Amino acid sequence: SLGIPMIDVNHLQGHVLVHFIKEKPEDTTPPFPFLCLLVSGGNSQIVKVNAYNDMEVLGQTIDDAAGEAIDKCSKVMGLGYPGGPIIDRLARQGNPLAYKFSEPHIPGLDYSFSGLKTSFLYSLRKWVQDDPDFIEHHKNDLAASLEHTIVNILMKKLRLAVKQTGIKHVAVAGGVSANNGLR
């Protein structure tokens, strides 16, 4: 109605391809095909990228996304929102092997983070019942262990995708890609 042309842009494809925006046009061609681990507050996907407009989702979350799990666990700890930067900062000072949280055992390349959230919540409830100051005294180790578990879940499936497809080039995109443990 305004007489202005509309350009169709897929937000998730933008995340996948943003790596290839360069100053010199000749430097912008991605090494097709490649895999992209797309992780954010709303999405956890493994995408096979064949060309700029040819992408195939090989695996995705069947419930909560990785970033959503981080945000919710941060909230349960009373750390605030968004939880990603907070958990990332605390994890740098913690022991990633201090606590063991549930990891899903689902076939294929799909992700699930709801079991991890439940495991984290129930563990915290038990520990806080025994020691009301538990979170404050152990927040660095809790953050590091949570981050370690989430990265482990993400990487297991990504390694499987590399093995299944034979594609060696991998990009990581989305807000959770800023996490130091994932990098």
Where are these regions (language model features)?
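A cross-family phosphate/adenosyl-ligand binding-site feature
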Residues: 6, 36, 81, 98
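Conserved phosphate-binding catalytic cores of ATP/NTP-utilizing and phosphoryl-transfer enzymes
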Residues: 4, 9-34
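Short beta-strand scaffold segments in enzyme catalytic cores
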Residues: 17, 36-38, 44-48
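A contiguous, well-structured pocket-lining segment that forms one wall/lid of small-molecule binding clefts
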Residues: 89-170, 180-183
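Short beta-strand-loop/turn "lid" adjacent to the catalytic site in phosphate-handling enzymes
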Residues: 1
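Glycine-rich beta-strand-to-loop/alpha-helix junction loops that act as flexible
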Residues: 40-42, 170-179
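Glycine-rich phosphate-binding loop plus the immediately following alpha-helix
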Residues: 10-13, 50-95, 117-118, 122-126
